[in-house]
């Protein structure tokens, strides 16, 4: 569970870490020993037991106006963080904070039908800020208040659910509303408070943002450092007690320009580590900032591409985003249940959904890929279930889905993927989505095959997608089952031997079932996409790993284009 974002930039539904908010949940750290129960967890357990054994017990038998809960849980996120932000060589913000937030989940009825049924899932959770000190009485009173509020909401919604059940037609999927799971116990060592030399890092972040002064066409830039140490506490009426620490450091650089025709263009880059000591050296960071500035200068001069339908190569990172958007969201368990969901893959279990040389797993237990930290890692999910690797697709054949404790037809239990932002009910979500291939080629060979495929189709060029920022996946029945992915750096690869040409204004569009089966081959090296993903259970950190991919047909359309002119007044000092 992650608290609300801090020092956040605007983001789309699923946004690459390069432009995402900086406060994230990161991989859990294994404890060397089982420490004593923290005061906070002890207070949670005590008040939870008192509430669970008391609520609804004073009502007369059969009185729906007061019902005992069949399940009660407390999930508390405690985080300390430091955030530093600079732009154009000046410090814009420097802050430290300490927060504790509690999510109280109350379920009334029974696992087969409870207050969360159908469109009422949000009624399970009530959130409240907790005292920052280990004052047991203050903690227990605050949890008591949150529990009472949550119980009232749950009771109102349970009565609505029972009424609706009398008038609704038979549901396609009549699975229960909550799965039975084995209680979990793991008491990790709480994360220490963040300790950062703010003066040193304020200077370093400011110096990095100053690099963009050398690029007059960069109209906006932000460099942000966020260091967050978080501890998640979970206790339930089933007997689960889980404490897991999460440490994360992220440096984000973001820059924007505008072409003469009014099109806004941006580039971004992130650097991640467990602590600030793991970040690159300052000289390497400054070189990366200069590369961003140069790429924006080139992009604003690049031609706008026309709509295209032909062969393309996705770089490893671009392919990772592509799989996250096009496939990953549609394999989340709750997408297979509900009258409003498109259920693209619900009835495809046991069938080929990818070429036979591709397999896909989601493994939140993996913390790194090579030397890159995977931000979607965790030890226990936000329902207190142990994280586990899930083999979703094996040799092209769909095997299972990403499951929370919401059952679906033929899949009755969680597989450790119930995730949520504070204040939301956990749902099945991606962690570290990893794509592997048995049909690999060196990148140079993929390029040759791209040119051959373009010639075969009578195209003057193919496309190479080097970098992608974000995407949007539509999974509901009320809209077409389509996706849109926004590339940042795209090249035309000409069949006649001309140099590759940088272009702009491209969006990748299509439908998932068709797009996924057009993959012809993959590269022999994989790359990582780290990002934030938003859905009904909030914004959470995710990762995806994939090799470069050659696709026989990739459809693109023009991006929406602004009409605002570049700044009329030159930047200060330009006249000198």
Where are these regions (language model features)?
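N-terminal secretory signal peptides that target proteins for export/translocation
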Residues: 1-11
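Bacterial N-terminal signal peptides
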Residues: 10-28
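Active-site bordering "gate/hinge" segments
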Residues: 29-380, 385-388, 394-397, 410, ...
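Short clusters of small/polar residues that mark proteolytic maturation junctions
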Residues: 267-269, 403, 504-505
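Short solvent-exposed loop/turn micro-motifs enriched in small/polar/acidic residues
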Residues: 305, 382-385, 426, 456, ...
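C-terminal, non-catalytic macromolecule-binding modules
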Residues: 399-453
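Hydrophobic alpha-helical bundle architecture
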Residues: 436-514, 530, 534-536
